[in-house]
């Protein structure tokens, strides 16, 4: 690939970045079509496409595939005698799945009652305190509800694109005058296949956040700091966990990292072996998510993971994570405001 062709590739990727979740949804739809056409409907969805829906009933919660129209959870009626029920997407945004029926079954006498959830995905059922109830969802997710889910990421997508364009404005002149033979990192080649390849490794960040002390080798002293945050500032850790479990948000971060790596000036990436790029891609996204809980944790993770590749690569990676910190902080603050407004309505 010539320098001019590489510049054109990055420009093309940036111009199409606002369509990132369209491609994601197309892949979801393609998977569902294959599953429906299959003799076996028990095909395991790739975790990359695993956007889930959630049913909350009292103090119980159950997650299921976005395509699952029939699933249940069991809970105990609280002392007040009112069982609160909520249906929503598993997302950093509490996007509701409303206007659907749920069946509430008293497990002692078998009496069944249908509760219609409102447009906010909420409803309640008068129950006998202390008795156990099964709450079963009986409604599919509509196309309009899926549209509302993905529309909620427009702000994050716009901020990431703006940041990438600002980065590219600094990188592009280096490509225009470079005589280096190294042409890009190659991570954008076969991009969807590359994304599937690294996805399960990226999801490791959930395990790190759930039990940081199990990852002292990867985090160093930051492991103890993360564990302390989980106790002293659970809200902060909750935000990081939400981001780590949100496939759409992680997908956008991964696409950002892929474009950014391929856009880096030739002299920045010349010393990076091609086989190392996939590993670096994984580490960039994990480091970015860890910064939400503790900025030092992201840097510590990258330092311990990348030290063997030299200070230059480490500096490049830390620069990426620090560059995204403000965007992700703003994003999570917007999520909090969104939830506060929704709860006040």
State each model region's role.
Residues 1-262, 298-309:
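Cationic, glycine-rich low-complexity segments
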Residues 268-298:
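Short, glycine/alanine-rich hydrophobic alpha-helices that insert into or span membranes
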Residues 302-345:
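Membrane-insertive, amphipathic helical modules of secreted toxins and fusogens
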């Amino acid at each position: 690939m010539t320098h001019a062709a590489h510049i054109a590739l990055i420009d093309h990727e940036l111009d199409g970045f606002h369509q990132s979740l369209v491609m994601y949804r197309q892949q979801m739809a393609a998977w569902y079509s294959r599953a429906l056409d299959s003799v076996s409907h028990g095909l395991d969805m790739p975790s990359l496409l695993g956007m889930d829906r959630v049913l909350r009933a009292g103090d119980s919660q159950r997650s299921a595939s976005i395509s699952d129209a029939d699933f249940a959870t069991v809970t105990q009626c609280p002392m007040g005698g009112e069982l609160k029920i909520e249906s929503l997407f598993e997302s950093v945004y509490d996007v509701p799945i409303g206007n659907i029926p749920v069946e509430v079954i008293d497990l002692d006498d078998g009496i069944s009652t249908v509760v219609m959830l409102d447009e906010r995905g909420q409803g309640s059922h008068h129950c006998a305190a202390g008795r156990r109830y099964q709450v079963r969802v009986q409604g599919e997710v509509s196309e309009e509800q899926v549209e509302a889910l993905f529309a909620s990421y427009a702000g994050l997508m716009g901020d990431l694109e703006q940041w990438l364009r600002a980065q590219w404005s600094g990188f592009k002149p280096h490509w225009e005058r470079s005589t280096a033979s190294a042409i890009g990192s190659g991570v954008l080649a076969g991009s969807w296949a590359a994304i599937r390849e690294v996805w399960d490794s990226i999801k490791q960040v959930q395990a790190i956040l759930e039990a940081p002390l199990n990852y002292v080798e990867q985090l160093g002293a930051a492991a103890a700091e993360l564990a302390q945050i989980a106790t002293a500032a659970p809200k902060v850790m909750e935000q990081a966990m939400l981001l780590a479990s949100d496939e759409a948000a992680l997908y956008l971060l991964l696409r950002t990292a892929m474009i950014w790596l391929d856009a880096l000036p030739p002299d920045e990436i010349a010393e990076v072996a091609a086989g190392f790029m996939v590993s670096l891609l994984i580490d960039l996204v994990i480091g970015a998510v860890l910064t939400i809980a503790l900025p030092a944790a992201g840097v510590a993770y990258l330092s311990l993971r990348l030290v063997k590749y030299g200070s230059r690569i480490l500096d490049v990676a830390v620069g990426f994570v620090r560059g995204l910190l403000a965007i992700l902080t703003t994003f999570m603050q917007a999520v909090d405001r969104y939830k506060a407004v929704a709860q006040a309505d």
